[in-house]
């Protein structure tokens, strides 16, 4: 991807994430589709005694720290959030302003505003797939991570929502040209567990120094149109940023999604990657 395309992708994702910041804290989004998966992922995180500095990269509104708060609020650890979208960053700062152990800074995966070898544990939920370059991002993770540090990341997999996206593309074809659709589809990284292994192996010695586990979790989530649109608008509106008549698009999308609806509702074929990197003992 060339420099101009990287910049456009970064700006598109950041701008629309910022604009939709309030939707991310909607109770529906915390308990439906990606929300449920995120809660499960975060609750399984394990903090060791050595993990004095924890950084959530692409922290959004601080959702992961929300989930963990009762367990970590009195910890002596330092919890840092890094987020490119100002709207989300502002919400995170406001929510955690009463606890001095939490701090938030503007930044991206490719430009983390932290010193070399300064973080014991890096976490991230549903953010890494939005980066312009996985190579640049993983190189930066390696830079800020302490040599004995660990990484826990949750991101969408290559086939996430594959069936759900087909009627979306049908609706998009009524409003966007081929070039615009291809541009929208390129906003998100589409990677498999094998891809992740290859990317991380460029920066981390997986043969001698680190272990990397990549699990692919799949689940079908059923809901009605309104339920799906709650989370889809919050997480995917940047994909239709160039649609001029968004009301008509939503009407067309509603009709298009009826083609995959079942007695249980409209299915979303969720496919998530859980990435865990640890130093070998």
Model-identified regions with their sequence ranges:
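Conserved class I S-adenosyl-L-methionine
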Residues: 1-51, 63-71, 88-91, 95
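A short acidic, Gly/Pro-enriched loop at the edge of an enzyme's catalytic core
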Residues: 110-121
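A short SAM/SAH-binding and catalytic strip from SAM-dependent methyltransferases
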Residues: 121-134, 157
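Short glycine-centered segments of the SAM/dcSAM-binding site in methyltransferase folds
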Residues: 53, 149-150
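C-terminal helical/coil "lid" or tail adjacent to the Rossmann-like core of SAM-dependent
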Residues: 13, 19-23, 210-264
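Conserved catalytic/acceptor-binding region of the Class I
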Residues: 135, 150-220, 239
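Core SAM-dependent methyltransferase catalytic element
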Residues: 203-204, 271-281
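Class I SAM-dependent methyltransferase SAM/SAH-binding core
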Residues: 53-111
């Amino acid at each position: 991807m060339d420099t101009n395309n990287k910049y456009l992708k970064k700006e598109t994702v950041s701008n629309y994430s910022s604009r939709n910041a309030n939707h991310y804290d909607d109770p529906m989004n915390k308990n439906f589709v990606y929300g449920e998966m995120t809660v499960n992922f975060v609750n399984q995180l394990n903090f060791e005694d050595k993990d004095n500095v924890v950084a959530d990269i692409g922290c959004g509104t601080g959702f992961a720290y929300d989930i963990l708060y009762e367990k970590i609020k009195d910890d002596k650890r330092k919890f840092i959030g890094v987020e490119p979208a100002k709207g989300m960053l502002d919400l995170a700062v406001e929510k955690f302003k009463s606890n001095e152990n939490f701090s938030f800074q503007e930044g991206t995966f490719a430009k983390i505003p932290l010193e070399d070898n300064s973080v014991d544990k890096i976490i991230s939920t549903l953010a890494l797939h939005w980066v312009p370059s996985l190579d640049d991002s993983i190189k930066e993770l390696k830079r800020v991570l302490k040599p004995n540090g660990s990484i826990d990341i949750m991101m969408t997999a290559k086939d996430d929502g594959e069936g759900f996206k087909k009627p979306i593309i049908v609706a998009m074809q009524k409003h966007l040209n081929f070039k615009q659709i291809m541009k929208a589809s390129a906003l998100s990284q589409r990677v498999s567990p094998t891809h992740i292994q290859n990317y991380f192996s460029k920066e981390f010695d997986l043969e001698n120094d680190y272990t990397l586990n990549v699990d692919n979790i799949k689940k079908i989530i059923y809901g009605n149109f309104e339920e799906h649109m709650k989370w889809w608008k919050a997480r995917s509106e940047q994909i239709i940023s160039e649609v001029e008549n968004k009301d008509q698009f939503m009407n067309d999308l509603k009709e298009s999604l009826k083609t995959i609806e079942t007695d249980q509702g409209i299915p979303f074929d969720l496919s998530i990657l859980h990435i865990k990197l640890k130093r070998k003992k």
